Structures are given as C-alpha cells and as structure tokens.
From Swiss-Prot:
Subunit structure and binding partners: NDH-1 is composed of 13 different subunits. Subunits NuoA, H, J, K, L, M, N constitute the membrane sector of the complex.
Domain annotation 4Fe-4S ferredoxin-type: ranges: 48-80, 90-119
Example of a GO biological process term: aerobic respiration
Cellular compartments per GO CC: plasma membrane
Membrane topology: Peripheral membrane protein
Name the record gives this protein: NADH-quinone oxidoreductase subunit I
Functional description taken from the UniProt entry: NDH-1 shuttles electrons from NADH, via FMN and iron-sulfur (Fe-S) centers, to quinones in the respiratory chain. The immediate electron acceptor for the enzyme in this species is believed to be ubiquinone. Couples the redox reaction to proton translocation (for every two electrons transferred, four hydrogen ions are translocated across the cytoplasmic membrane), and thus conserves the redox energy in a proton gradient.
Chief location bin: membrane
Organism listed in the record: Cronobacter sakazakii (strain ATCC BAA-894) (Enterobacter sakazakii)
Enzyme Commission code: 7.1.1.-
Subcellular location: Cell inner membrane
Length: 180
C-alpha cells in the first residue's frame, strides 16, 4: 500500500461522511403514502367510471365506440333497447388488469358517460377482482359535466315521437327557413 492509496482512501472516506451528513438533514423525497396525500396533476387519468344524466338515468347508449377506441381491448359491452327506443348497455365490463388508462375511451364517448377519475388505488389480491361490471362502474352523479343530457342535446328521435316532441326537448330549427 502506497501513500497515494492511503490519501485516496482517506479522501473517499471524508467524501462519504460529507455526503451522509448532507443528506441526513435535507428534505426527504420519499412520501409516506397512506399517511401523506399524493399530489396528482389536474389532468391525471385514473379509474374509469360510468356517469348518469341529471335526471338519474344511465348516460351510456351502448354505441360501442369506447370498445373500438381502446388500444388494448379491455372494454366489452352488449347493447339492449328499452320500450321507448333508447339504447343502454345490457352489460358493461372493463378489465383493469389490461387497462393502460390512456383516456381514449373517454375521448370517444359521445355522451360523456365514461369519465376517468383521479382514483388510482386499484390493488387486488386476485386478478378476477380487477374485472369491473356495470354495477361497479356506475356512480350516482353526473361527473365532470353536470348539466349534459345526450338525448336532449343530440335531438335524436325516440320511437313513436318526432324530433322535438320528447320530454324537455326543444323543437328542431328549420335551417332552410333562416336563409335569405
């Protein structure tokens, strides 16, 4: 062992002591998760929910656009029809073990029925428990868009009624009558 090795070893020891002392009294980067809340950005995409209209009905019209837009194919649903001609999902299933939370389903949904919430705690012990059915996904409120009602906004005709004759629906505008 030479004098150079001793000096280098001593310098290394001093540098290590200095770094330990420096980091011992600095602010910690680790978050104590359950006790401390985690900061989530305003546009964070977490768990998917299905919302309802302001009158309490399901917003989803089972158009299947969300399942087509999903890049991993984790959404499956089956369309059914009520007696007045409105569509609704007979079953709606999302496999969260495959979902990548990209938000494509939310963008594709014409009725704003699918919305992503900031909830990220989806840990389960069994993989089967990560498959959510419609009953698990439906929430009681309208979500981000409280006043939006698809059937009122879209002006879609319902069986047995002309456009504008349905409940709380405005008469259609005659666009050609507005021309000079």
């Amino acid at each position: 062992m030479t004098l150079k090795d001793i000096v280098v070893g001593f310098g290394t020891q001093l540098r290590s002591i200095w770094m330990i002392g420096l980091h011992a009294f600095s602010k910690r980067e680790t978050r104590m998760y359950p006790e401390e809340p985690v900061y989530l950005p305003p546009r964070y995409r977490g768990r998917i929910v299905l919302t309802r209209d302001p009158d309490g009905q399901e917003r989803c019209v089972a158009c299947n656009l969300c399942a087509v837009a999903c890049p991993v194919g984790c959404i499956s649903l089956q369309k059914a029809e009520t007696v007045d001609g409105r569509w609704y999902p007979e079953f709606f299933r999302i496999n969260f073990s495959r979902c990548i939370f990209c938000g494509m389903c939310e963008e594709a949904c014409p009725t704003t029925a699918i919305q992503l919430t900031p909830d990220f705690e989806l840990g389960e012990f069994k993989r089967q428990d990560l498959v959510y059915e419609k009953e698990d996904l439906l929430i009681s409120g309208p979500g981000k868009y409280p006043e939006y009602n698809f059937y009122r906004m879209a002006g879609m005709a319902i069986d047995g009624k002309d456009k504008g004759d349905a409940e709380n629906e405005a008469k259609p505008i005659d666009v050609k009558g507005l021309l000079p």
